[in-house]
A protein has these predicted regions:
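N-terminal alpha-helical "arm" segments
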Residues: 1-36
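Sequence/fold signature of self-assembling virion shell proteins
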Residues: 2-6, 10-13, 194-288
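Assembly/oligomerization interface modules of large self-assembling protein complexes
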Residues: 24-94
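A short glycine/small-residue-enriched secondary-structure motif
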Residues: 89-100, 282
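Broad gene-expression machinery/nucleic-acid interaction feature
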Residues: 93-97, 178, 262
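Helix N-cap / beta->alpha transition motif
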Residues: 99-101, 181-187, 235-237, 277
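Alpha-helical scaffold segments that mediate packing/assembly in large oligomeric complexes
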Residues: 99-173, 286-287
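Extended, solvent-exposed, turn-rich assembly/linker loops in the middle of proteins
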Residues: 140-212
Length: 288
């Protein structure tokens, strides 16, 4: 739970009164030299996230007309489930176990313990997004022009508005609304060159940190390093595309090792990922 502004002000006031407190306050304000910003998950934006009650199983009734794609039980492979009336989205863990030598904690001018946790959480979110785009690739790779799924749209760079409009049309012909477009920064550079006449560019820093860079014809364009280069994914609304059942949300457990004099943490989440509507996805494959 986050502290209120009044509580924060009181803590700061108490720390300022002593030399040790001022040193601690100064250390908390120092930031390490970073290679890049911490990763923020964007894959969940195109799935309906559901917290599972204790004892509940991630079982869903499925339209027999559509094939469901799920991440396997160990999170290793993608399964295609076609005929059953019900489908279970297997749960799997994504974990990170940072370890910090106790001697390093005092040597750093920043909060090393908090930074280690932030990095671990960031990498877990990046790994989760990797599984999301693997599912999208599985759907697109099995797609045919059968009126239910949408075959890939080949594109010779640069990407043009007319090509992306065709991708929108593939989804909208199924009475679905396009809500998200996922791109790598290398491919988004083509879209950025369209200018403000086509693109409604977001400039707020808080939005940029979440991966949201622009709106196009009512849909959000989200950019991430986890999106494969030379691929763009156009997706329908979350409730019509898939589910992410969550048994255990991102959790931090203490895993210290006194004999090795290390401070450790076990950071993990237990989730499932499944897409039940292949018609809600269209993939552009770009040749450069």
């Amino acid at each position: 739970m986050k502290a209120s502004n009044e509580t924060k002000q009181k803590v700061i006031s108490d720390l300022i009164k002593t030399a040790a407190g001022r040193a601690k306050l100064a250390a908390s304000m120092v930031q390490p030299l970073r290679f890049r910003r911490d990763y923020t998950s964007i894959g969940r934006k195109t799935f309906l996230v559901e917290a599972l009650p204790d004892g509940a199983l991630p079982i869903y009734d499925k339209d027999p007309k559509a094939t469901a794609y799920v991440v396997g039980e160990e999170g290793e492979n993608i399964l295609a489930i076609q005929k059953p009336k019900r489908v279970i989205f297997p749960l799997f863990e994504i974990a990170s176990n940072p370890e910090i030598p106790l001697t390093q904690v005092k040597e750093r001018r920043f909060d090393l313990i908090e930074r280690a946790q932030d990095l671990a959480k960031s990498e877990i979110q990046a790994e989760e997004d990797g599984r999301v785009f693997e599912i999208m690739d599985a759907i697109a790779g099995a797609a045919t022009d059968d009126g239910i799924t949408n075959p890939d749209i080949p594109v010779v760079a640069p990407i043009t508005p007319s090509v992306l409009a065709d991708s929108y049309a593939d989804i909208e012909r199924h009475d679905l609304r396009v809500a998200k477009v996922f791109a790598n920064a290398k491919d988004y550079s083509d879209i950025r060159k369209w200018g403000r006449d086509v693109l409604d560019i977001e400039t707020q820093q808080t939005l940029l940190k979440t991966g949201l860079l622009a709106y196009l014809w009512g849909a959000q364009i989200l950019v991430s390093r986890r999106v494969p280069v030379n691929h763009l994914y156009t997706c329908c609304e979350a409730e019509m595309f898939g589910r992410i059942p969550v048994r255990t949300e991102l959790t931090v457990l203490s895993a210290d090792d006194p004999k090795a004099r290390t401070i450790g943490f076990s950071i993990f989440e237990n989730i499932g990922i499944g897409a039940h509507n292949p018609a809600g996805l269209s993939r552009l494959v770009v040749a450069r």
